[in-house]
């Protein structure tokens, strides 16, 4: 029997940058099958898109997060925005920036029972990815709270807001009489990151502020900005805002972070 060499061209043409794929979750060097994507990356894209859609509609579980925070020794307040459900939240962004009447009353009662205000108010909202909050809020808060205690700042009970958007933190902070407010919120899911957590920090919060008054730290998750690094950056912003009495465009995030030492040469230079 004579061996015959198969000269049929490979179905998938590999990309010369394929070695770079192990360094990033980004969709690079996927190769091609003719003029189209190969089947495997096409299916992976569809799966990632489905994960992103699921993250947007995943119901927030404030009771589970509340239990985690209670285990850390934190008091909590369960609140709700003026958006009655997920559909209205997505269609009416303005309602996600406001508290409903019972939540506003609850904060008013708490503030009346604790006159004088507080230094820090922490707010957690589901945003566009409850998955991010479920996975990352509690471990991040543990690091932030430790830094807040080290500064000697007072902290209000952590407010858990269902169907909340970023600006709802301004109302929470104002009603609690907080000098500074931080909201941890699920970011809009991406095709490689359905669980990214965002932090928004504001000094002297009040209803009606714009994004110019806020500082943002984004993509908080183990595959992005780790918990320790995010807490470090946030505490830097808090200290500087306290000193300068301002945030947003008045405050530049310039926290020093430790540099990683390379364990080997950059393969691009070899």
Swiss-Prot record:
Binds between the large and small subunits. It is found in: Bacterial microcompartment. This is Ethanolamine ammonia-lyase small subunit. GO terms for molecular function: cobalamin binding; ethanolamine ammonia-lyase activity. Adenosylcob(III)alamin binds at residues 166, 187, 216. Its EC number is 4.3.1.7. One of its GO terms (biological process) is ethanolamine catabolic process. It comes from Ralstonia nicotianae (strain ATCC BAA-1114 / GMI1000) (Ralstonia solanacearum). The basic unit is a heterodimer which dimerizes to form tetramers. The heterotetramers trimerize; 6 large subunits form a core ring with 6 small subunits projecting outwards. Pathway: Amine and polyamine degradation; ethanolamine degradation. It comes from the Bacteria. Its cofactor is adenosylcob(III)alamin. The keyword Lyase applies. NCBIfam families: PRK05465.1. It catalyses: ethanolamine = acetaldehyde + NH4(+).
């Amino acid at each position: 029997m004579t061996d015959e060499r198969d000269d049929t061209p490979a179905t998938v043409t590999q990309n010369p940058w394929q070695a770079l794929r192990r360094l990033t979750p980004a969709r690079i060097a996927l190769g091609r099958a003719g003029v189209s994507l190969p089947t495997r990356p096409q299916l992976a894209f569809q799966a990632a898109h489905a994960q992103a859609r699921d993250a947007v509609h995943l119901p927030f579980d404030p009771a589970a997060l509340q239990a985690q925070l209670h285990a850390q020794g934190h008091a909590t307040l369960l609140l709700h925005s003026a958006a009655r459900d997920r559909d209205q939240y997505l269609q009416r962004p303005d309602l996600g920036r406001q508290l409903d009447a019972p939540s506003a009353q609850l904060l008013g009662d708490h503030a009346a029972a604790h006159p004088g205000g507080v230094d820090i108010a922490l707010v957690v909202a589901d945003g566009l990815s409850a998955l991010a909050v479920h996975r990352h809020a509690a471990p991040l808060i543990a690091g932030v709270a430790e830094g807040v205690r080290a500064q000697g700042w007072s902290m209000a009970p952590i407010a858990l807001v269902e169907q909340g958007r970023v600006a709802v933190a301004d109302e929470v902070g104002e009603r609690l009489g907080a000098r500074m407010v931080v909201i941890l919120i699920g970011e809009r899911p991406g095709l490689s990151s359905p669980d990214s957590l965002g932090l928004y920090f504001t000094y002297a919060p009040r209803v009606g502020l714009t994004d110019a008054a806020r500082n943002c730290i984004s993509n908080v998750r183990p595959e992005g900005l780790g918990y320790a690094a995010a807490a470090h950056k946030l505490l830097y912003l808090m200290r500087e805002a306290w000193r300068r009495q301002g945030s947003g465009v008045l405050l530049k995030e310039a926290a020093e972070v430790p540099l990683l030492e390379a364990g080997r040469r950059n393969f691009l230079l070899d």
